[in-house]
């Protein structure tokens, strides 16, 4: 076989690059899904703290991976999960929360009155502006695909 899986990593013959195995990524996503269930009722900062312990440990183990694109995708996916969680938590105050965070009246109105669900709305420009990646970094959310010092 071209790819070998060992201890959560996949090593390919071509170029011999180490990447995180698909099964390990799916297990991480399952853990994140558990922590970011929209019905938990915890504050966003508490969810980020819980995620921090999981992601820091995962990053420590899988930090030697050379293929970073799947890790970048996980980073984006985690931020989207958190935006979805926050939107669901805001409920009917969504418009007010968006306006408070600098979203224009029109964008906030269109987003808050949308018929789409929280997951779909979590990728809208309004929520990305209200809850940017920088905010999650300030809360302490680690990035898996962060460049390593050589």
Regions found by a protein language model. Give the residues of each.
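Non-catalytic terminal/accessory segments
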Residues: 1-150
């Amino acid at each position: 076989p071209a790819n070998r899986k060992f201890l959560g990593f996949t090593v390919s013959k071509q170029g011999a690059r180490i990447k995180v195995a698909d099964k390990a990524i799916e297990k991480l996503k399952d853990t994140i899904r558990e922590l970011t269930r929209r019905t938990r009722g915890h504050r966003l900062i508490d969810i980020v703290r819980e995620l921090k312990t999981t992601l820091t440990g995962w990053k420590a183990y899988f930090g030697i991976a050379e293929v970073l694109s799947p890790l970048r995708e996980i980073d984006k996916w985690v931020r989207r999960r958190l935006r979805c969680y926050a939107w669901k938590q805001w409920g009917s105050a969504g418009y007010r929360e968006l306006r408070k965070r600098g979203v224009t009246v029109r964008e906030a109105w269109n987003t808050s009155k949308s018929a789409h669900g929280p997951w779909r709305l979590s990728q809208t420009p309004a929520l990305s502006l209200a809850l940017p990646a920088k905010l999650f970094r300030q809360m302490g959310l680690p990035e898996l695909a962060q460049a390593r010092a050589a």
